[in-house]
Each structure stands twice: as structure tokens, then as C-alpha cells.
Amino acid sequence: MFREKFRKFHFIGIGGIGMSGIAKILLDMGYEVSGSDVRQNDVIKELKEKGATIYIGHDAKNVIGKEVVVYSSAISNVNEELLKAKELGLQVISRGDMLADLFRMKEGIAISGSHGKTTTTSMISHISHIAGLDPTVLIGGILQTFGSNAVLGKSELLISEADESDGSFLKLNSVINVVTNIDKEHIGYYKDYEDIKEAFVKFINNVPFYGASVVNIDDTGVRSILSKIHKKIITYGIESGDFQAKNIVFNSDNTRFDVFYKGIKLNTIELQIPGIHNVYNALASIAVSTLMEIEQPVIRDALKSFKNAKRRIEFVGEKNTNLIYDDYGHHPTEIKSVYEALKSKYKDKNIVVVFQPHRYSRTYYLIDDFVDLFKSLDKVFLLDIYGASEENTFGISSLDMINKVSKEECVYIPSKEELFDRLDELKDSVIVFMGAGSIGQWSHEYAKT
């Protein structure tokens, strides 16, 4: 009754992957949706096709006649639409609060962690879909199962990524929480690593008495907080865990491993995606699916048919005898995982990482981790930092990393044109474009030139 009072939603920054997902769900629920962003992209095109009114550019008049205004964390406090909405007395809420409201309407599974959220959420969603559970899904990427980052299901089940970057994951009323790992990330929001870990303690302890959290026991960050957890946890890992992967084999076309639960073999799993990190992601999805009482043969068959979300070790094509991949990874841990995954698949090829650093703050705080990593890779083409919404108050640049690496195989590339020329010189290599900024379309553009 009360929620029907509000029918007209406006999203400031609607083109973002998280904002667009919520907007799609509301459209499918029958609400009127409009939104603004600074540029067109594929998700905006999909929103238009679904019936959303989209404005390119922000303007105060865009919020007139709306009832609820949702804004993303990337939106400035002095954004003209945000200020006008407050002046008009409209309901103004953050993306995190809007997601929390969706969780109140459903029984939720929230997947968090510094790395692996999108793939783990995608796996759980795919298994649930194959099992006929008809979930509502919100993912930080385009899942090939649905061809979208959001799907409205008919059941009470909601499966969603939970964003720790701004602390909004603590607002979610979920029945099952997943923590894939806890790493040094989002230092611009959190005071330090200990502050990040405390947030995850609260997240895990947020589950109700009838719920549980599924956590990666092999991760040092997770292990360091276990003494502070007073709610039910289920662990997974390779070294140990309630759910454990053993007999792992990396082949050129698949990854195989056996799954054990408390010492008893449950299944033999075959994945079509490479990497030890995806074994961990699969273990998390198996643990959650088992909690949901999905039969083991269904889990096995679903994971065998699973295709990862776009920009997650996504194969783009072949050019000049080189294989081209694309990945969203922008943290040293993620780059290392992707590099090792491709090495396990292409043991005799050079892996060339084309990396666009994302945010000045992340580059500044993690520069030593980036430098140590780059020293160990076959070859790195390093682009300028993509600042996102940040000003460069840190005085940091990609050349600072180049100077610290001091390695011939780590090269600064100042432009896309020069990058493409340098890539054309390579033969029989695996090229992976990595980053969360404007590099997102470069791999496809290069493959077509």
C-alpha cells in the first residue's frame, strides 16, 4: 500500500552498472523511470529500449515532476539535479539505500569481498536460474545467462553484489552473506586495512539467526576476523574449509576439481573459465547453492555450462597471431589472478598486460604493490591513470610506477594510437586489456582495426 505512493523515479548517474541494474528492476516492476548521465553507453541504450526516459547531461529541470531521486556515489554534493531535488522536497536516496529497500522486499543473498564479487554472484545466479528458482538478480557486470546486469524474477529470492567500497553493504537485510576475501582496497573511504576488516565483521554479523555467512577460510583477511564473528559461518577453501576443492587440474580448455564437504566427496566440477581464483569463486557458489538445497547434479551441470560476465577474462578475438582478452581488474591482486589464469591456460605464450590504472588514490596507496607485481609479469604496457571522479591531489602518475619498476618489459604508453601500433609488433602472444575506466572498449576496438 505505502510503496504505491511513489511511482516516478529519477536516477542521477543512471549509466553506471549498479544504478542501471536497479533502474531496470524498477522498470520491470512497472515503475516510471528516468535518469541522466554525462554520456551514452550500452546500458543506457538498453534502458531506453525498456522505456526509461534518458537525459544526456545533468540539468535541474530533469527532476521536476519526479517523486524519488536516486544518486550514485560518483555524484557531487553540488550536482544541480541533486540540489533541485532537495529544494523541491523530493525523496532523495543513495544507490545503496535503494538497493537496501529492494532487499526488504525479498529474501536476499548478498555477495561481498574485495575481489570476485561479480563472478561469484554470476555463478550463484546461473545455478539458481538453472535450478528453476527464478531469482531477481543484480550484478556488477553483464551476465551472459541473461544478457543483462539485472533480471526481475517471480520468486522471493534476490541475489546481488554487495558494495563495500562506500560501506553501503552494511545496510542490506540479507539471509545469506558471502565474503570472498578482504584486501587493502578503497583506502580513500576507509581509514586503513583494519577499518576495512571491521566493516566486514559487521557485514557477517548482520545476518539473522536463521541465516549464515559463507566465507573464504584460505584468505588471511577473513581468518584475521573470525574471533569477532558470533553468527553462523560456513567456510570454503582449498587448503581447508567445510567445502574444499581437491585434485585441481588446469587444462587448456577447462578446469576440473573435486568438491568435498567435511571430508565427504560431493561432486566433480568442470569449469570453462581458467584460474585458481575461479575455483574459489565456484566453491563459494557451491556452498551457497547447497545451503539453498539445490541438488548436486544441478550444481555440477550449471557450473559446466557457466559463461562468465563480460569483461571477466573475456575472449575478444585474434589478431596478428595474438589472442586478445579483456578484463575489468584494476587492483594488483586482480591483475595477478588474471595473469596466472591466462598462464595456466597458455603455458607457452607470453602474457602482455595492457593496464590503465583506475583512480589516483588507489594508485597512490597501492603503488608498491603494483610495482612488485609488474616486476614479475612477462610484459606490461602502462597507460595514463584514469581519474574517474577524482582530482589528482596526490601528484601521482603512471611514470612514477615506470621509474620504480625499472624494467625493460614495463613500458609507458601515452596514447591509444601508440598502444595499437606497439601491439601490432607482437606475435604469438596473449594480450589482456585491464582496467575499470575508458579502456573498457579498447580491446574490441583494437581487434577490429
UniProtKB/Swiss-Prot annotation:
ATP binds at residues 113-119. Its main location: cytoplasm. Keywords: ATP-binding, Cell cycle, Cell division, Cell shape, Cell wall biogenesis/degradation, Cytoplasm, Ligase, Nucleotide-binding, Peptidoglycan synthesis. GO terms for cellular component: cytoplasm. SUPFAM superfamilies: MurCD N-terminal domain, MurD-like peptide ligases, catalytic domain, MurD-like peptide ligases, peptide-binding domain. It catalyses: UDP-N-acetyl-alpha-D-muramate + L-alanine + ATP = UDP-N-acetyl-alpha-D-muramoyl-L-alanine + ADP + phosphate + H(+). Its EC number is 6.3.2.8. Pathway: Cell wall biogenesis; peptidoglycan biosynthesis. It is found in: Cytoplasm. HAMAP family: MurC. Cell wall formation. This is UDP-N-acetylmuramate--L-alanine ligase. It comes from Hydrogenobaculum sp. (strain Y04AAS1). The gene is murC.
